Curated annotation (Swiss-Prot):
SUPFAM superfamilies: Homeodomain-like. Its main location: nucleus. One of its GO terms (cellular component) is chromatin. SMART domains: CENPB. The gene is cbh1. Binds to centromeric K-type repeat DNA and ARS3002 DNA. The CBH-binding consensus sequence is Py-Pu-A-T-A-T-Py-Pu-T-A. It comes from Schizosaccharomyces pombe (strain 972 / ATCC 24843) (Fission yeast). The keyword DNA-binding applies. Residues 69-144 form the HTH CENPB-type domain. The keyword RNA-binding does not apply. It is found in: Nucleus; Chromosome, Centromere. One of its GO terms (molecular function) is centromeric DNA binding. This is CENP-B homolog protein 1. Keywords: Centromere, Chromosome, DNA-binding, Nucleus.
Length: 514
């Protein structure tokens, strides 16, 4: 006999979403199920919990709306379409573009043909009745259509730099953060054109791409885990090697364009604000519509920012720049390209095609090395000074670029390229203009529709690469080798050896090697 289905009220659904969204870290749905059982004495299936946490019920997160009003509004019949149209609408608002009821219906028609989940279904009638229900679901006033919303704006300073510095002055440098994004063609090889789009087994090399969200504070004491966006929800190399991104200290996201979408940016902003709990920090963002969309979405719904003041770096000024454009991204990419080229040459020496041998997991390890060790505190500090955000920056010119220069030299040695022209080509290889997505115009409907493409299991054309699962005993033995190695150093660091002992005992407390 099948279990009796238990009714879940809107108030209970809202409580589930609040519990999940307000947790300090992302919690598994199993934990949400257990919490609900203890709190409400009801047993819900994981599929029910998953549905409640899906975008279908995102309207429950708006704290300004009463549950009594919500009861009058039915959930959308096609939630993916509803979410896509709403995100498109918000992008139009952010960009200050005109909006009309007919434009909303036309966007819905275009989205229908681009969302695979609806490919086999007949096109609905996007009538005035559908439009009215859409407006009511998202609390869009009639006056808000035909004009861009003006209720929420950034702190934008377009006059003199001193105004910006006065705004920043109350914050200690450890509490001043900047976030930036970039794309990375992680299989890119150097050539005369610096970016070769020749086909590799039917896939252009430029398609082997990820996008990254980077964030650090002004004194370089905190660099947050990278957020890396690819094409596949769970890349084949992750599954085959049994790895967990959080254990490697990065967050993995995905969509059909491997790009930083407004939805991902909104999620990142909430994640950042939660990490800053108990502090009052300033977050500076590059001038980018995606970032602006994310900030406005956070401010408009779900309680807004609790620990963070947001400031957008002016787009057109000679005096103020993003710190990421003053050395941080260049240093990161130079170190990544160095690791990738060294790997490529090693594979060529053993008669393997590096473009097939590499996979996104290997590339991510080089990204993590480059971010955590290639970009030094000195590089970050000097980049903030050169940005002009903290005051006059002339004394910072050329500082903090040692890691970048070293990587440039090593890349030149790897490809046997020397001279001023070679340096120019290496610089263009490290930072090709095609990776700067902010300069490329994207159709708003296509951009949003990419969020709903079917899942991929791979990032690029690559060979199978299965890494064996490491047992506790094997890990403990590896620690034993490390411990003996450092014990044999006459001037070794005893605190480091003790730390190895502690970690070994955590891994295999009952299987220590004598």
């Amino acid at each position: 006999m099948p279990p009796i289905r238990q009714a879940v009220s809107l108030a209970e659904k809202k409580a589930i979403r609040d519990y999940y969204n307000q947790s300090a870290h992302r919690i598994p749905q199993k934990e949400v199920t257990e919490w609900f059982r203890k709190t409400y004495n009801k047993d819900l299936s994981q599929s029910t919990i998953s549905e409640i946490l899906s975008p279908k019920y995102s309207y429950l997160d708006d704290g300004s709306v009463r549950l009594g009003d919500i009861k009058k509004i039915r959930a959308p019949k096609f939630p993916l379409l509803d979410n896509a149209v709403y995100e498109w609408l918000q992008q139009r608002e952010v960009e200050g573009l005109p909006i009309s009821g007919d434009m909303i219906k036309q966007a819905a028609t275009r989205f229908w043909s681009k969302i695979p989940a609806y490919a086999s279904l007949p096109l609905p009638d996007f009538s005035n009745g559908w439009l009215d229900k859409f407006r009511r679901r998202h609390y869009i006033q009639q006056s808000a259509v035909n004009q861009a919303l003006e209720s929420i704006k950034f702190e934008v300073f377009r006059e003199y730099p001193v105004h910006i510095q006065e705004f920043i002055r109350p914050y200690a440098q450890k509490d001043i953060f900047c976030v930036g994004g970039t794309s990375l063609f992680w299989k890119l090889t150097p050539n005369k054109q610096n970016l070769d789009y020749q086909e590799i087994q039917g896939m252009k090399r430029g398609k082997a791409k990820v996008s990254l969200i980077m964030c650090c504070n002004a004194d370089g004491s905190e660099r947050l885990p990278l957020w890396i966006v690819g094409y596949a929800q769970n890349p084949r190399s992750f599954e085959q090697c049994g790895i967990f991104p959080k254990s490697m200290n990065f967050e993995w996201k995905w969509n059909g364009r491997a790009s930083i979408s407004p939805i991902i940016m909104e999620e990142w902003l909430r994640w950042f604000d939660t990490r800053m709990q108990g502090r009052k920090v300033l977050l500076m963002l590059e001038s980018n519509d995606t970032y602006q969309f994310g900030v406005e979405s956070v401010r408009r719904f779900k309680g807004g920012f609790q620990n963070t003041s947001v400031f957008r770096i002016p787009e057109k000024t000679l005096d103020i720049k993003s710190p990421f454009e003053q050395g941080i991204v260049d240093t990161f990419k130079a170190n990544y390209r160095r690791y990738w080229l060294q790997y490529s040459l090693n594979q060529i020496n053993i008669l393997r095609d590096p473009l097939k041998a590499v996979n996104v997991l290997k590339a991510i390890r080089w990204m993590l090395w480059s971010w955590n060790f290639g970009v030094s505190e000195k590089t970050i500090q000097a980049s903030f000074l050169r940005s002009g955000l903290l005051g006059p920056h002339s004394e910072a010119e050329g500082q903090g670029m040692e890691s970048y220069q070293k990587a440039i030299m090593e890349i030149g040695n790897l490809i046997s390229s020397k001279g001023s022209e070679a340096v120019k080509q290496i610089n263009e290889y490290i930072r090709p203009s095609e990776e700067d997505e902010t300069k490329l115009h994207q159709d708003a409907v296509d951009t949003v529709a990419a969020e709903f493409l079917e899942e991929r299991r791979f990032e690029s054309d690559e060979e199978e690469d299965v890494e064996p699962q490491i047992s506790n005993v094997e890990a403990a033995m590896a620690f034993e080798v490390l411990i003996k190695y450092f014990e044999q150093h006459e001037n070794g660091d005893p605190s480091f050896v003790l730390d190895l002992y502690r970690r070994q005992r955590v891994i295999a407390p009952n299987n220590l090697i004598a």
